[in-house]
A protein has these predicted regions:
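Terminal targeting signals and extreme-terminal segments of soluble enzymes
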Residues: 1-217
Length: 217
């Protein structure tokens, strides 16, 4: 079913441009977004250091990880779990995504597009925006013993998602996605992610609040 994108011009300044985007399908609003664009310029710079983690070349491939975990995955989710994805992931912690053991609200994983992308930075930003949703909400579930796949026990949803692009990058080269969840309260989990190139450059950040409501037994 086609989606209509309605773009509204909010502001055009010397350095900044702002737009709002509404996605409409079958007469219903299904998505809205506020977008801010800025010209490039020289200025003050600093950044967080990249976490000290193994390189993606030292870790199991996504396919190797899925094969290793397939006997531990619920049958109802196995087909989707084994299917090839548009984003390749190499988990640093090598966690079973369906293991309900409690853990710290941190996660690191290497991500990249599965195929070669054109030399257009907007495409790379779009691909990374898509990938930035992966694993983010589930970080706030870990301290409470709910795995990334605990859908039978939790009512979950992404409530909002914000992203900032700091520096240029390629989404078809390995990027470290370093996730943490500073807080969960009121049945909502607050999650953050910083994205680094292999040489340690911080290129993007994401923030997401997600519903993590425990279902009645």
């Amino acid at each position: 079913m086609p989606i209509l994108y309605d773009v509204q011009r909010i502001r055009d300044g010397k350095s900044f441009t702002t737009r709002t985007v509404n996605a409409i399908q079958n007469g219903e609003y299904i998505f809205n977004m506020s977008v801010s664009f800025k010209i490039s310029e020289e200025g003050l710079e600093h950044q967080f250091e990249m976490p000290d983690v193994p390189s993606p070349e030292e870790l199991k491939s996504d396919r190797e990880f899925r094969e290793e975990m397939k006997d531990k995955i619920p049958k109802a989710m196995l087909e989707g779990f084994l299917r090839d994805k548009p984003i390749e992931i190499r988990n640093v912690e090598n966690l079973n995504p369906f293991d309900n053991e409690k853990g710290e609200p941190f996660k690191n994983m290497w991500i990249k597009a599965s195929g070669k992308l054109p030399d257009n930075h907007l495409i790379h930003q779009g691909v990374l925006a898509y990938a930035s949703d992966m694993g983010l909400r589930g970080t706030s579930q870990r301290p409470h013993g709910f795995s990334f796949g605990a859908y039978e026990k939790l009512q979950v949803a992404s409530l909002d998602h914000a992203m900032w692009f700091h520096r240029e990058f390629r989404a078809d080269e390995w990027l470290l996605y370093s996730l943490d969840s500073p807080s969960a309260s009121n049945a909502n989990g607050f999650n953050r992610g910083n994205i680094f190139t292999q040489d340690g450059k911080l290129v993007a950040s994401a923030v997401q609040e997600g519903l993590i409501r425990v279902k009645d037994k």
